Amino acid sequence: MATSFLFSLILLLITALSLPFPLHASSVDPLSAGATTVRYWNRKIPNNAPHPDFFLSLLSPLPASVSSSLSSPLSISPSICRSARLLCPNSTYFQSLSSTVFIDGCTFSYSCTFTYEHTNITIKPGIFFREQELKEGNVVRMPDIANELTTARSSFLPRSIADRIPFKAEAVKSLFGLEPNTTLAKAVDETVAQCQSSPSKGETKRCVTSAEDMIDFAVAMLGDDIVVRSTVLPNGPGESIMIGKVKGINGGKITSSVSCHEYLFPYMVYYCHSVPKIRVYEAEILSVQTKEKINSGVAICHIDTSAWNAGHPAFVALGGKPGQNKVCHWIFNGSMTWVIADKS
């Protein structure tokens, strides 16, 4: 019996390792946990909006049957870690990972401040800007929007597995065998601490550990006629770019959104928070030299910053105090924002 179960599990893992990287909903294996998520999306958001590639790429490649086959108590073996496209602690990626890569998620929390080894952190030029800078023909500094975390192609766990893992730092480190004081162990500590911190005034937040959890939160905050947007390609980072055509989503009216930012964790975790009183823009990003389009960017402008922490990186970069100025930033490659479907 045990031999038969082990053989079946090995076959499932081989299948998972051979699954194609998803690009379109139709290409997601119908027996995978990712396909289950696509069907869940269609039930919860019935507006026939396309499923963007950047979201599909995060879905679990595991066959749906694997999650029900895992033993109890749950254990994550190296083979499961690889086949589920998780960030395994013994991978080459983690040996070269910078100790500060996971700070960017905090950057977009209202309450974020330099509290965790941030003393010598340099804020990326162009990461924050004024709303008036987002104008066709302007030449601005584009920050490095290529999120280092996305290079590892990590995935969400199936919800049935993620829900079985206590969202506690010691439990996660034990489950994944993380050594103390390693980059990943420190990131787990920081992520859990940020997720468990109290929300700022006017903010509703949730750290989501599955794609279904993210969908639920976005629908709860905005309703079911929504779409998710992100910067399309990581072109133009760290250099001056020209702003092309700019479109205000929903006519540029003040609205609300749910923004989600990736945290460094053994499996995919996003810090999602409701963002009231914002304007969302889509902008063409052009080469200064050729004037040719090299990217499509999504930017959010926060109209009311009165509830933000006075030590927030935006005020360090732009000056001013909470409530004095509007603050805009690009949605980084790897982050995303959910908004009400555009009617304009």
UniProtKB/Swiss-Prot annotation:
Signal peptide span: 1-25
Taxonomic superkingdom: Eukaryota
Key words, A-Z: Glycoprotein, Signal
Tissue occurrence: Expressed in roots, stems, leaves and panicles.
Residue span(s) of domain BURP: 128-341
Glycosylation sites recorded in the entry for this protein: N90, N120, N181, N333
Protein name: BURP domain-containing protein 16
Organism: Oryza sativa subsp. japonica (Rice)
Organism lineage: Eukaryota, Viridiplantae, Streptophyta, Embryophyta, Tracheophyta
